[in-house]
Every structure is written in C-alpha cells, then in structure tokens.
C-alpha cells in the first residue's frame, strides 16, 4: 500500500508548486532515479513498459511524444549477449530495467577517450591568442548583415584551414563556396556532420554529381551526441545541436544557423562571432568531437601533424607568392573590406610587404613561407597555388566573385559538372554589391 502512495521526484515538486502553503524548497539538481527506470523500460519494452514503470514509481510522463519516438527509433542492441551482463538472472530478453536500482542517471555511459592530437602548438604560437578578445552578435532582422551572406564571406575569405560543425548541410551554394576554397585556393576543410544529417548531405551530393574525386582537400566526417545506455545494454545516441565555424584558427562563428535554404531565407536565426581566447574553447570541443567521428566522404585519414610555426619553412617547400599574400591579408574580421589596414582593430601583417608601401627603418621582410600548414599536415599537390599572371586591381576585384555566381556556373567553373554552353558570359564579371 505504501508503494501506491509513493510520489516521483517530478510529481512531488508539481504538487508543491501548486500548493500555496508549501514553502519553496532548496533547488535539487540530483538525478531522477524514477526517470531513469522509465527510460530504460522504454528502451527495453516499449511504450507499455514505460507507462507501467511510471505508474509504479508514481511519476509523471516526462517525455514528449517526439522524444519517445526518437528513443525507440534510435535504440540499438548491446554489442554482446545479454547473459554476459547479468549472468543467470538475465532472461532471454535481457535484464528487467525496472528491477534494477542505480545511483546514476546514465548507468553505463562511458566517458569519451582522450581525443587524437589534431594540432599542437605552444601558447605563444596559438593564432587565436594574437587577436583581441571580442564578441559580436548578428540577428536575422538586420538586413544589411544577412546571416547567410556573413557565413559565405567567412568561407570565401578563409586562406588556410576551415573547420565546420553542422547538424544539417543541404545548401548547394555554401557547398560551392567550400569546394572553391578547397580546390581553387588550397584551403583544407574539415566538416563534422551530425550522424542524422549524413543522408541529406549525400542526397545533395548526388543531385549536383559530387563524388569523392572532387573532395581532394576536404574531409567529411560524421559524429554523434552523447550515448545513453540502459542496464540491459541497449542504448541510443543523441544528436549534435552545436553549430560553429572556425576560420584559420583565428575566429569563430557560432549560433542557431544551419546550412539549409530555409535557414538562409525564412527561418529566424542568430549568429555570434568570437575572437581571442574564447576560440580556444571551440578548439578543444572540436578536438573531442573529431576524435569520435567517422569518415563519410573525402579524405579518410588526414595526416595529423603540428602546424609550422610562423617564420619556419614548411616541409613541402615554399608556397607561391599569390597564396602567401592572401595569407598575409587574412583578418579576424570576415565581414570587413579586403584591406586590413583600414581596420585599426585587426592585425596588419602585410603593411610593408608590398612595393608601394612607405619606407620603413627596418630591413625588408624575408621571403614569405607558408605560416600554417593546418592540423592535418601539408596540403595535397592538387592544393598548391600558382602565381597569377596578372596581379593587378582587376584580379583583386574579381577574386571573390564565386560567392555571387549562380550555383550551376560555380560547379561548371570548378570542373565538377559538364558545361551547358562554352560561350562567355560578360555580365557575370560585374562588381558585387554588398
């Protein structure tokens, strides 16, 4: 009889907050054993077992219909036979989770192993520590700073390494920006996708006829969220809801924006830009997620070496002058103009590198070397850049027009789809309007 009068943790609190005579209790953040037992029952026996445990524990239904369906759809069998876990007490269908007591909410959830070393540098060599710490927030309502355009500018102005963590990736134009950065400018790109969004990403690749042969400098990998494991051994994985972009290890774009057409045109989103020491937190999070990721497309096992310190010669020789100048012009502000000198808050490392710069008391700088190989080693031979035959103002004006060309034309110029017509389209060479 006493069992029927038992109240679960959530139900008891609901009764207290409804009553005017009960004093507020101290906040309790401990695990809910009744909720754990009910979740285990849902994994092992379905909805009927879930409701039965809720009735026995005197607990309320704490899962929404969407959450309950997700748990049942994502449930996975244990890797080993159930009798090895429970011995003779385990039945033919495994352990009865309602008869097991546990002091933790995730009874068998194991902590992730130490991530593989993606890059290693001393504190003085960390690129993000050379930038001033700042935080900027962008909303969808600001029309002159469209979030989709901000993301695309960030991609087109990255010169060395681009790291992306995303839940859904189906925007073909953003994909073209990434392909152009990797195949035309030698930028190494690593995309970590939520496991649930891999199918949609592959559908997009099939529609535009993109295969592994087009991803020579890109690594597409999948990653899951946290793992919930029941006493019986059945488990399910959560989703990746984190979304951020790290550009050249100097600044981060993070927010609610997903790489979809709807997010770029109708969904309301928020985007934040971080520079300075805050980037280190995203760097560490990416290390852990990369360590548990699995290859999907592109580079399967990138070579993990430390980046070349500034001023040291890279192992694969000198980079071309055009690529070196692009790296020198890299700024932590992806939304500013191309001239870093017009922004006093950004670092300007190429102020005296050009022939038209004013005379300085110090000697001319040494030949440029590749300042940063990225966390996966030297770029592939296909990623090497050659000097441009015309390095005048027109080249600088039209160098970023890939972000403003139609999707089909971008794929054609990347050599990924056959051209519809060989005629030249002069109207596409107009200067972009921001």
Swiss-Prot record:
GO molecular function: identical protein binding; phosphatidylinositol 3-kinase regulatory subunit binding; protein kinase binding
Superkingdom to which the source organism belongs: Eukaryota
Sorted UniProt keywords: Cytoplasm, Phosphoprotein, Proto-oncogene
Location of the region described as DUF1669 in the Swiss-Prot/TrEMBL record: 1-298
Region (Disordered): 76-97, 308-399
Extent of Low complexity compositional bias: 320-332, 348-357
Annotated domain remarks: All members of the FAM83 family of proteins share a conserved N-terminal DUF1669 (domain of unknown function 1669) domain of about 300 amino acids. This domain mediates the interaction with casein kinase 1 (CK1) isoforms. Therefore, it has been proposed to rename DUF1669 the polypeptide anchor of CK1 domain.
Record's function text: Involved in mitochondrial maintenance during adipogenesis. May be acting by playing a role in the maintenance of normal mitochondrial function.
Complex and partners: Directly interacts (via DUF1669) with casein kinase isoforms CSNK1A1, CSNK1A1L, CSNK1D and CSNK1E.
UniProt-recorded name of the protein: Protein FAM83A
Provenance organism: Homo sapiens (Human)
Gene that encodes it: FAM83A
């Amino acid at each position: 009889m006493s069992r029927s009068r038992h109240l679960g943790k959530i139900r008891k609190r609901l009764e207290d907050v409804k009553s005017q005579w009960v004093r507020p209790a101290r906040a309790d953040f401990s695990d809910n054993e009744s909720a754990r037992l009910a979740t285990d029952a849902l994994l092992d026996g379905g909805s009927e077992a879930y409701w039965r445990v809720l009735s026995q524990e005197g607990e309320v239904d704490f899962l929404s219909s969407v959450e309950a369906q997700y748990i049942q759809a994502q449930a996975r069998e244990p890797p080993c036979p159930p009798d090895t876990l429970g011995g003779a007490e385990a039945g033919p269908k495994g352990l009865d989770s309602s008869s097991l007591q546990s002091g933790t909410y995730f009874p068998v959830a194991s902590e992730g192993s130490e991530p593989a070393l993606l890059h290693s540098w001393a504190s003085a060599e960390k690129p993000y520590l050379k930038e001033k710490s700042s935080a900027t927030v962008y909303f969808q309502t600001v029309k002159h700073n469209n979030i989709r355009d901000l993301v695309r500018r960030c991609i087109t102005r990255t010169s060395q390494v681009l790291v992306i963590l995303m839940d859904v990736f189906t925007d073909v134009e953003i994909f073209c920006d990434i392909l152009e950065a990797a195949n035309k400018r030698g930028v190494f790109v690593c995309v970590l996708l939520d496991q649930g969004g891999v199918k949609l990403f592959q559908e997009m690749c099939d529609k535009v006829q993109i295969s592994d042969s087009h991803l020579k400098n890109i690594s597409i990998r999948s990653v899951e969220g946290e793992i919930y494991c029941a006493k019986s051994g059945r488990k399910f994985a959560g989703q990746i809801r984190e979304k951020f972009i790290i550009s050249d290890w100097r600044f981060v774009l993070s927010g609610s924006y997903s790489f979809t057409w709807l997010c770029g045109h109708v969904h309301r989103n928020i985007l934040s830009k971080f520079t300075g020491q805050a980037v280190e937190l995203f760097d560490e999070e990416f290390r852990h997620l990369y360590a548990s990721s699995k290859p999907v497309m592109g580079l399967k096992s990138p070579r993990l070496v430390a980046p070349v310190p500034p001023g040291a010669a890279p192992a694969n020789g000198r980079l071309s002058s055009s690529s070196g100048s692009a790296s020198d012009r890299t700024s932590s502000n992806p939304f500013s103009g191309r001239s870093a000198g017009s922004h006093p808050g950004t670092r300007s490392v190429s102020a005296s590198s050009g022939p038209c710069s004013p005379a300085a008391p110090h000697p001319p700088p040494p030949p440029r070397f590749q300042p940063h190989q990225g966390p996966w080693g030297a770029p592939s031979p296909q990623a090497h850049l050659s000097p441009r035959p015309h390095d005048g103002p027109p080249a600088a004006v039209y160098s970023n027009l890939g972000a403003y060309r139609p999707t089909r034309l971008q794929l054609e110029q990347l050599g990924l789809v056959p051209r519809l017509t060989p005629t030249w389209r002069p109207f596409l060479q107009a200067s972009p309007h921001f």
